[in-house]
Amino acid sequence: MRMCDRGVQMLITTVGAFAAFSLMTIAVGTDYWLYSRGVCRTKSTSDNETSRKNEEVMTHSGLWRTCCLEGAFRGVCKKIDHFPEDADYEQDTAEYLLRAVRASSVFPILSVTLLFFGGLCVAASEFHRSRHNVILSAGIFFVSAGLSNIIGIIVYISANAGDPGQRDSKKSYSYGWSFYFGAFSFIIAEIVGVVAVHIYIEKHQQLRAKSHSELLKKSTFARLPPYRYRFRRRSSSRSTEPRSRDLSPISKGFHTIPSTDISMFTLSRDPSKITMGTLLNSDRDHAFLQFHNSTPKEFKESLHNNPANRRTTPV
């Protein structure tokens, strides 16, 4: 089914829907379901079994009436009596229920109705916005119509097999083209229903894959911030790092003031909070500064007193 194009599938669905509805409508409306031998004239009280046997002619019947093909009543049709008075059955038996269902022909009529609605759904799928949902409805209608059709055919066969007048002869009846039209309508309806459901499943899978890919794409772009925002965050993070706030070695050598000098010029707000530890630290820092300040002076004097470093003026 994947090898077929979607347009071919829709063409099969449309043509199949029209064919199934047409065949079933013709089958229900015609009288060529069954060919059998029977009496065409109306029953009378003086009739016996022998006279009726001699007057039997070939007839064709549908769902509601029987027509004669031979004899003096050729071409005459009469309504089918599904509940004859001389029939040997009780009203509470399964045969009576079968005859009642056969007389009502509810399943063939229901099949035609479902096929009609299925065809409307197929036609509406060409214009409706959410066409895949309409196609699913059409598939459900056609599958249900096929099931109703086959149930009606089974009931019809069972009713004919259970006819008391047909039991003594195995070859006393045969099925006509109307019956086969109904059978072909069942096959086509089931094929159309399966194709319609397959179209819906394929379309649903495509929409699901498309929505899944769009969702993944949106989530991927949501995780990645814009370039400017990332650059701004990166620059701000660099400015907030502790290493970025440290001074370079050159600035440390020439433009910084030792922390001990700063501590010498800072005063405590509360003189009562000065402890022995702070006094010792200040004395130690003061001694260190004296040593630090005296070292360059002595070094300068040694350089000045060195005779190699003296400048001599030529005479």
From Swiss-Prot:
Cellular compartment(s): Membrane
Membrane-spanning residues: 8-28, 104-124, 135-155, 181-201
Biological process, per Gene Ontology: neurotransmitter receptor localization to postsynaptic specialization membrane; positive regulation of synaptic transmission, glutamatergic; postsynaptic neurotransmitter receptor diffusion trapping; protein localization; protein targeting; regulation of AMPA receptor activity; transmission of nerve impulse
A single MF term (Gene Ontology): voltage-gated calcium channel activity
InterPro entries per UniProt: CACNG_subunit, PMP22/EMP/MP20/Claudin, VDCC_gsu
Keywords annotated in UniProt: Calcium, Calcium channel, Calcium transport, Ion channel, Ion transport, Membrane, Phosphoprotein, Transmembrane, Transmembrane helix, Transport, Voltage-gated channel
Region (Disordered): 232-252
Modified residues (Phosphoserine): 248
Domain of life: Eukaryota
An annotated GO cellular component: Schaffer collateral - CA1 synapse
Membrane topology: Multi-pass membrane protein
Purpose: Regulates the trafficking and gating properties of AMPA-selective glutamate receptors (AMPARs). Promotes their targeting to the cell membrane and synapses and modulates their gating properties by slowing their rates of activation, deactivation and desensitization. Does not show subunit-specific AMPA receptor regulation and regulates all AMPAR subunits. Thought to stabilize the calcium channel in an inactivated (closed) state.
Family: Belongs to the PMP-22/EMP/MP20 family. CACNG subfamily.
Subunit organization: The L-type calcium channel is composed of five subunits: alpha-1, alpha-2/delta, beta and gamma. Acts as an auxiliary subunit for AMPA-selective glutamate receptors (AMPARs). Found in a complex with GRIA1, GRIA2, GRIA3, GRIA4, CNIH2, CNIH3, CACNG2, CACNG4, CACNG5, CACNG7 and CACNG8. Interacts with AP4M1 and GRIA1; associates GRIA1 with the adaptor protein complex 4 (AP-4) to target GRIA1 to the somatodendritic compartment of neurons.
Protein name: Voltage-dependent calcium channel gamma-3 subunit
Name of the coding gene: CACNG3
